[in-house]
């Protein structure tokens, strides 16, 4: 059963991939033409048509060139989706057997690597932590697959799209079932690669290409630190499998690395390097810049990346390595600081964004910050609880955005929407439920998990915990404001584009069913599981999959916080709702006036704190200058000038000068002969005189 959960998506990928290859060969028997021969021109004309209507081509979720689909496209869709639903059902069964039935599963698959002292076996490790992730990954992926059948119905390359989705899911499943750091790293890099392919799926769009490359490169920065962390763990323990590492972890306390003139605590260094990987993969502060640009990919990709796969990998990794982080309080302080700063930063940026998908993207960034605050204060199960609930309502919001985009003919700017509640009522109510859960409305899924994080931060004993508490409380109010801003500007008020508004309609049934299912999860994923993740049943539920230090009483103390602490998140949620209603329903002139009055602040937030511009100045432009200099000076002038090109140029110079001697005049040749004879006689005389 457990092997089937992991490998069924891989089987679906292979089937869809073969259909995609066959379709490509049938469409282009002589090989795929250049971008100017197919697709690109059609896509440019499609974008130009949007521009002709006065719209920003950047703010559209286009579906690529209009070409006939490959034969077997429907089979590829149905096969991958069916296999994912089977995997989902098996995952829920595994959750019951492992999480509730106290069963654990270990299965070796193959001997992976044997080099010197390094031995890595590829095996499946299914404990409660894994079971939770299996449910999240397969459930969200299954509904994203079903949703994509309707969303991508006009795309001729959908077999390739479904192959990518399934391989993305398999990579994440390989990551969460990993029994060693090396296997986890392969899954880690797999989701990174697949995010690159899916974000850049419409590769004829320059914006999609740029976003894919940006995501790939920013994650390489984090992955470099993650790699160093794995090397350091192997150096300290001589192993990469989790059981050996965790058994030796207590003995590593007090060990140091001597670096330059410093003696650094070994566990702190290791945990910080590993967390650097989590910062990149989970789009935390400083390595967050790729996440909003990832919206250039198809909307189902956004839902899968943000709800169940790539961005949750960092949170899962910290939870899996809780035996190490519990012994490194300084590293935990850094985790809290980065998480809390991310939660607040992303919430402030989300206040003024106008792209419907980017608003939800920044909410993801912010909510991931909440999860890391929980991890930093030692409330690992609470962080996993928020990961679990967040997956349902965040996937719901993204897929709801996709339905809005389809209804508005691929428009994504909320300033051009309005009044859609009457045109797409089902989508409205589904997004309404998702917004309630995101803002933490009482008794929704988000209410139980997000409030628990704030309470855990309040009682945390880490010196940075109070900073986490303050930031998450403020972010709760901001989250409520920008979430309801999105709802009010999209679905309420007067329509701003009457042409698109009149033509708006509900999407295909395959897109509506996932919305309904995820809305159910957004409501019910909280209360039934609250005791397992945050109550007295945590130790029995997670058993050895999470480690809590002897002095870690956060889960117990968080149930005894003052009443004002427990009520603060709800008050902030209500305050954000009231302000948004005042600004965008009752007095829509207020935000316009405030934007004019505080233009520097508004521009600062609109430009995302200028991180893109800062990184462009500090890293991108210098790197481009270095590359251009090495190309022009190093390669062109030095290597080619004194190497192959230089030798050939000198040969040409010599032959050019020799050719000049061939004048064609007889007296020139006679003169040359006389000079030669004279030179010979002179040499002979001197040579003879020497003897």
Residue ranges and their predicted role:
Residues 2-12, 76-90, 130-137, 161, ...:
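Hydrophobic alpha-helical transmembrane segments of polytopic
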Residues 1-11, 71-82, 118-136, 174-187, ...:
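Membrane-entry segments of alpha-helical transmembrane domains in multi-pass membrane proteins
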């Amino acid at each position: 059963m457990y092997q089937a959960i992991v490998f069924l998506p891989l089987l679906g990928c292979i089937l869809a991939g073969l259909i995609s290859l066959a379709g490509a060969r049938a469409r282009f028997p002589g090989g795929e033409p250049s971008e100017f021969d197919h697709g690109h021109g059609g896509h440019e004309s499609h974008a130009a048509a949007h521009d002709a209507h006065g719209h920003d081509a950047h703010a559209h979720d286009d579906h690529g060139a209009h070409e006939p689909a490959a034969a077997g496209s429907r089979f590829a869709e149905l096969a991958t989706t069916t296999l994912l639903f089977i995997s989902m059902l098996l995952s829920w069964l595994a959750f019951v057997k492992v999480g509730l039935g106290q069963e654990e599963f270990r299965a070796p698959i193959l001997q992976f690597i044997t080099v010197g002292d390094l031995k890595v076996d590829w095996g499946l490790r299914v404990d409660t932590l894994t079971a939770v992730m299996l449910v999240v990954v397969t459930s969200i992926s299954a509904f994203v697959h079903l949703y994509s059948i309707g969303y991508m119905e006009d795309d001729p390359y959908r077999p390739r799209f479904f192959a990518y989705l399934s391989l993305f899911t398999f990579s994440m499943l390989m990551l969460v079932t990993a029994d060693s750091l090396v296997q986890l790293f392969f899954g880690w890099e797999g989701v990174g690669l697949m995010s690159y392919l899916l974000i850049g799926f419409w590769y004829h769009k320059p914006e999609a290409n740029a976003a894919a490359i940006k995501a790939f490169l920013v994650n390489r920065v984090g992955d470099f630190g993650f790699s160093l962390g794995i090397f350091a763990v192997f150096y300290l323990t001589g192993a990469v499998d989790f059981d050996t590492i965790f058994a030796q972890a207590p003995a590593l306390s007090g060990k140091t690395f001597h670096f330059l003139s410093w003696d650094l605590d070994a566990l702190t260094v290791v945990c910080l390097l590993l967390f650097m990987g989590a910062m990149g993969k989970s789009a935390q502060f400083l390595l967050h810049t790729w996440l909003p640009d990832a919206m250039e990919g198809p909307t189902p990709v956004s839902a899968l990346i943000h709800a169940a796969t790539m961005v949750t990998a960092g949170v899962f990794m910290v939870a899996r390595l809780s035996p190490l982080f519990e012994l490194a309080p300084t590293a935990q302080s850094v985790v809290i600081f980065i998480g809390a700063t991310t939660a607040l930063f992303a919430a402030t940026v989300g206040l003024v964004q106008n792209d419907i998908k980017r608003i939800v993207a920044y909410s993801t960034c912010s909510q991931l910050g909440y999860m890391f605050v929980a991890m930093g204060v030692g409330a690992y199960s609470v962080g996993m609880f928020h990961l679990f609930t967040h997956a349902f309502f965040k996937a719901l919001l993204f897929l709801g955005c996709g339905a809005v985009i389809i209804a508005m003919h691929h428009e994504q700017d909320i300033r051009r929407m309005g009044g859609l509640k009457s045109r797409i009522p089902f989508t409205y109510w589904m997004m309404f439920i998702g917004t309630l859960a995101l803002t933490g409305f009482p008794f929704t899924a988000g209410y139980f998990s997000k409030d628990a994080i704030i309470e855990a931060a309040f009682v945390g004993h880490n010196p940075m915990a109070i900073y986490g508490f303050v930031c998450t409380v403020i972010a709760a109010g901001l989250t409520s404001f920008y979430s309801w801003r999105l709802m009010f500007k999209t679905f309420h008020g007067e329509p701003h584009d009457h042409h698109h508004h009149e033509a708006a309609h509900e999407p295909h049934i395959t897109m509506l069913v996932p919305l309904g299912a995820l809305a159910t999860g957004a409501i019910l994923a909280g209360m039934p599981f609250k005791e397992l993740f945050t109550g007295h049943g945590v130790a029995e539920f997670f058993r050895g999959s999470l480690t809590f230090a002897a002095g870690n009483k956060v889960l117990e103390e968080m149930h005894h916080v003052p009443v004002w602490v427990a009520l603060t998140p709800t008050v902030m949620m209500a305050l954000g709702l009231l302000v948004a209603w005042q600004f965008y329903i009752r007095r829509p002139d207020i935000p316009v006036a405030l934007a004019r009055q505080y233009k520097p602040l508004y521009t600062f937030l609109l430009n995302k704190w200028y991180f893109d511009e800062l990184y462009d100045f500090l890293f991108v432009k210098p790197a481009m200058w270095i590359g251009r200099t090495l190309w022009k000076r190093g390669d062109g002038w030095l290597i080619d000038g004194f190497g192959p090109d230089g030798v050939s140029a000198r040969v040409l110079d010599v032959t050019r000068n020799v050719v000049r001697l061939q004048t064609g005049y007889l007296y020139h040749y006679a003169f040359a002969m006389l000079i030669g004879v004279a030179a010979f006689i002179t040499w002979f005389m001197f040579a003879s005189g020497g003897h």
